[in-house]
Amino acid sequence: MSKAREIRTKIASIKNTQKITRAMELVAASKMRKAQDRMAISRPYASKIRKVISHVAASHAEYPHPYLQQRENIKRVGYIIVTTDRGLCGGLNVNLFRTAIADMKKWQADNIGMDLCVIGRKGEAFFRRYGGNVLAVADHLGDAPEVQDIIGIVKVMLDQYDKQQIDAIYIATNEFVNTMVQKPLVRQLLPLKTDEEEVEGGYWDYIYEPDESKDLLEMLLVRYIESQVYQAVIENIACEQSARMVAMKNATENAGQLIDELRLIYNKARQAGITREIAEIVAGAAAVE
């Protein structure tokens, strides 16, 4: 019967773990919905500011802003890597690392160097081990970060670009497709391509008084990059919570299956013990007779 007691102890332990994973699943689901709401709110801003940049840039075609000009000889590129602070979110970070490294190897093949700015503790730990040149790290942003939280890391990368220390900036992050699907991707932030459809249409909504549109363009471009990084952070949080919710749901279901299996083993062990005891009683009675 000692085996049966051991199985009962295991079942009790797994039940406690199951309660924890179930609670984590519910918390992640709540946080995911909030992150989705923030993501939906911030998207129109980024879209509109992109159109304004296209208008202002087209109105001053004689003023080629460095953020809009493709550099001919690329010697070094920068990456902003958006990861999570915590684990227990399935393969979210691992898939992103694979995608980012695959993109980086294209530059390495041409002997082009890379600088990294990393958001999230998981990314920092990985690229410190991997050997990347990490310029800055932003972590502990929480579940509801503000734009101010990422301005510093964006400034580090933009300063490198302004000094021509790097010739292009990319961002690696996770795109929220739906609750079950999160897609890792790498896209270019700088140099920025203007919206060709808006420019060709020749339709202008804005009159600038006084005409300080050059300064406005400078400010808008910086704000746009900040908004893109912030949007990526918010979207990555939605991906994180979604992946964690699914992972905890699977863990809860697996715990239930394991409990069922252990109960079956326990019942068999208990039945075998009872059968053995009955056999011993019968044998003892027969010996007395």
UniProtKB/Swiss-Prot annotation:
Gene3D superfamilies: 3.40.1380.10, ATP synthase, gamma subunit, helix hairpin domain. Keywords: ATP synthesis, Cell inner membrane, Cell membrane, CF(1), Hydrogen ion transport, Ion transport, Membrane, Transport. InterPro entries: ATP_synth_F1_ATPase_gsu, ATP_synth_F1_gsu, ATP_synth_F1_gsu_CS. It is found in: Cell inner membrane. It is a peripheral membrane protein. GO terms for molecular function: ATP binding; proton-transporting ATP synthase activity, rotational mechanism. One of its GO terms (cellular component) is plasma membrane. CDD domains: F1-ATPase_gamma (cd12151). It comes from the Bacteria. Its main location: membrane. One of its GO terms (biological process) is proton motive force-driven plasma membrane ATP synthesis. F-type ATPases have 2 components, CF(1) - the catalytic core - and CF(0) - the membrane proton channel. CF(1) has five subunits: alpha(3), beta(3), gamma(1), delta(1), epsilon(1). CF(0) has three main subunits: a, b and c. Produces ATP from ADP in the presence of a proton gradient across the membrane. The gamma chain is believed to be important in regulating ATPase activity and the flow of protons through the CF(0) complex. Belongs to the ATPase gamma chain family. NCBIfam families: ATPsyn_F1gamma, PRK05621.1-1. PANTHER family: ATP SYNTHASE GAMMA CHAIN, ATP SYNTHASE SUBUNIT GAMMA, MITOCHONDRIAL. This is ATP synthase gamma chain. It comes from Coxiella burnetii (strain CbuK_Q154).
